[in-house]
Amino acid sequence: MPMKKHLNDQKMSLFLFIYIWIMYAIVYWTKNCFSGAMASIVAEGIMTKSQTGLITAVFYLVYAPLQVVGGKLADRWRPDLLILIGLIGSGIANFIIYLNQNYYLMLIVWTLNSVVQSALWPSIFKIISSELAHEHRIRGVYYITFASTFGLCFAFISAALMSKWQNNFLLSSILLFIMAIIMAIVYPIAARRMVPDETGPAKALHEDFEHPEDLDTRSFTMFKKCGLFILLPVVIARGLLGLGIKNMAPTLLMESYASVSPVVGNFLNIFIILSGIVGMYFVKRIYPKRINDEVKGLGLIFTILIPVVALTLLVGKLPLSPMVIILCLIIALTEGSGLFTQYYTVKFAKYGKNGEVAGYINMAAAFGIVIQSYGVAKIADMWGWIAALAVFLALVIISVVLIIIVIPKWKKFTREYHM
């Protein structure tokens, strides 16, 4: 296990974060190339919604369990090497799909892409929450959430602007290789300027550090006590709902409103995705000043989601504009809840568990995407959009119940472990 180090040089820390932000936005864009192109692929008759969804579903089905392994690796190995593996491997996968659009080959290549990317996010989160200058860590956790929002937007913008949807994969491949080259240059420079952490587990966001010797800091014990395993289904629901709306909104609107073409659907979806910024800003304003409990904040957002998601059952009956606003509200709330889970994860950096927790959280979110990509798409194919949206509503209600169970566990845990 490498010695824990961090940057004191604030300029270098800021420069490293800016690179990581751009790199992660591009990675998130490339992970969603199929989602961005779904409306065009379906409209051209190349694949059905469920076939396109299956490619994304298999990606996340393999990606999800490997997130736990990736989280453990991020806590033990050099994060830059794990990131390089992800960037280069993903660049190769995107280029192969640009060259050959055989359905089964795409399915295999995209599955291998999920393997090489498995440690990428935990490694990114490890750098932000443990290796940046102390002053940049909490802000870094906040601003990195915008990278995924803009990355997904770029996926739909490029899909709408490209003359052929295959070109999206070519551009993705080129950018991933460029990011890999920059990573190989920038991180070693930053690493040479890092200083060793103080004795004991790495400090996360604060200068003070308490680590009573009688506490059981084994991962499984800590995660069981804090209610992490009960919270994972909530993260699954968030991933399913949030990315489900983002990925399926163009097709949903296209099939529910005659005035919406694939191109119009993609452009409308850009506004829906960008609304997530409002939700993240809202959470930043209330945390930690008004709500300093991450799980309670999560509960508040999911409670608000219940009536908002219920309104989606009126799709096709309500005019287009109100429905787009409703979808925007859902994305704002799900992105806000995602920021609460990021703050929740950072708490564990105090005990050197932040990479592992990030892996579990990302694993759960990935399972949600699996269910959305194939399961919900299949429900929409067989029984229509109302049935698929009813599934979203049921999951939100179940999530509220689970959060209520976790709240007292988390409160007790944070007191016991001085978080």
Q: What function would you assign to each model-found segment?
A:
Residues 65-101:
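Conserved MFS/SLC helix-loop-helix module at the cytosolic interface between two early adjacent transmembrane helices
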Residues 293-340:
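C-terminal transmembrane helical hairpin of 12-TM major facilitator-type secondary transporters
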